[in-house]
Structures are given as C-alpha cells and as structure tokens.
C-alpha cells in the first residue's frame, strides 16, 4: 500500500533527523535503518532484536502498522476459512473468541487490551484474540443485523464514542482489573452497538453521502 511505504519513509527521516537521548540515532547504523525501513515498507514485522528504537515494536518507524498487519492476517483467514463458515457456527465461535479476548485483557500488569504491537508470544496471542473476535463479530452482525429506523443515529453514536474516549483508563493501578472489564465491555458491547446504530443511518444529505463515500474509498 502506498500509505505504508510513505509512512515508513517519513518515519525513517524523522527518526534520523530527530534523534534524542532516548532514541540515540548515533548508535544505529545506516544499514540497520535502511533494513528496518525496507521491512516496514513491505509490512514485515521486526523481531525484538531488530528494533532500532528500543521498544521492541513490530514496526518501529510506523508504529500503528501493527494493526494493519493483523488486518492482513484477517484478509487471509477470510479468503480461506471465514467466508465458508456458516452463520450457525459463527454464533458459537464469537462467544469463544470473546472469552479469549477477556483472558487477554487480564494478562500483564495493566489489565488492558493494548496487545499486538510487538512480536512476542503475549502480544501475538493478544493481538490475535482482538482480531478474531472483532472480525467474526463483524461478520455475524453483517449477516444477521437488519437496520431499523433509529432517530438521530449520528448523535447517539457520537455521544457514546465521546463518553467512552473520556475514560481511557478506569480504576487506576490499584484497581486495574476494572480497566480490563471496561476494555472488554467497549469491544464486545459498546463498539458493536455504535456500528449497528450507524448502519441504521439512512436519511443523510447528498453532500454528507459524498463525503462518507470519499472517506470509505480513501480507507
């Protein structure tokens, strides 16, 4: 994807010219920087030993690419497996993946679902559960949900998202288990609700429709 390549190149430039005490570019050879940039361009994850920033990231020059990496895995799984899975089977496996997601939320010291950004066992398992639940739940909703008439769906969805993002962490370090419950609730209940509400939005202006279509095509 062009945006992946552009992001990797920009990341390499910014890393090289904005070095600091934490990210000492002087300790990174040009060959290592070039190799990491090339891996990022082709969306090939870096191992812990190959990370040039010291955080152990899959994609140290364009961190958010880890999410796109798991999306590519989803595309492969859909092409070979999930598109053939019946709706009845989805009703069984979605709750199972939700259990796995809950398990992932309570691993580590912080009780959250911020897994998937590093090529470690814990991060890969956590990232896969995030992927498997969200993707299969989306398939199930697309097959079974029939949009109805909901008044002000945009307002409702926006308010829910604003409220959720105002609470990025719940319970603090002492009661971090509360944050695990909150993260699981958001992914398994709140976000699917927002998606269903948004799918019920039909009465939109031509201008809004063109903007939404353009954003969808851009994505």
Each predicted region: which residue ranges?
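Small-polar-interrupted transmembrane alpha-helices in polytopic inner-membrane proteins
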Residues: 7, 89-109, 157-165
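Generic alpha-helical transmembrane segments of integral inner-membrane proteins
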Residues: 5, 9, 13, 76-80, ...
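Membrane-interface helix-loop-helix regions
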Residues: 3-70, 100-115, 121, 185-199
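Alpha-helical transmembrane segments in multi-pass integral membrane proteins
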Residues: 48-55, 81-85, 114-219
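Function-critical hydrophobic alpha-helical transmembrane segments in multi-pass membrane proteins
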Residues: 57-82, 131-133
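Structural motif
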Residues: 1-4, 219
């Amino acid at each position: 994807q062009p945006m992946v390549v552009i992001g990797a190149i920009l990341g390499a430039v910014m890393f090289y010219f904005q070095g600091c005490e934490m990210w000492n570019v002087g300790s990174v050879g040009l060959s290592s920087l070039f190799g990491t940039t090339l891996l990022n361009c082709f969306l090939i994850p870096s191992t812990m030993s190959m990370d040039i920033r010291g955080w152990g990231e899959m994609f140290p020059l364009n961190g958010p690419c880890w999410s796109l990496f798991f999306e590519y895995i989803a595309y492969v799984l859909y092409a070979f497996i999930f598109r053939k899975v019946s709706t009845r089977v989805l009703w069984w496996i979605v709750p199972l993946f939700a259990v796995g997601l809950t398990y992932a939320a309570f691993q580590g010291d912080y009780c959250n679902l911020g897994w998937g950004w590093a090529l470690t066992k814990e991060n890969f398992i956590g990232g896969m559960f995030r992927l498997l639940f969200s993707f299969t739940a989306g398939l199930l909703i697309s097959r079974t949900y029939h949009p109805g008439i909901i008044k002000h769906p945009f307002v409702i969805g926006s308010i829910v998202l604003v409220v959720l993002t105002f609470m990025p962490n719940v319970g603090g370090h002492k009661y971090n288990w509360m944050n695990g419950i909150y993260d699981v609730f958001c992914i398994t209940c709140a976000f699917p609700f927002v998606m269903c509400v948004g799918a019920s939005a039909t009465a939109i202006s031509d201008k809004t429709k063109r903007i939404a279509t353009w954003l969808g095509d851009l994505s």
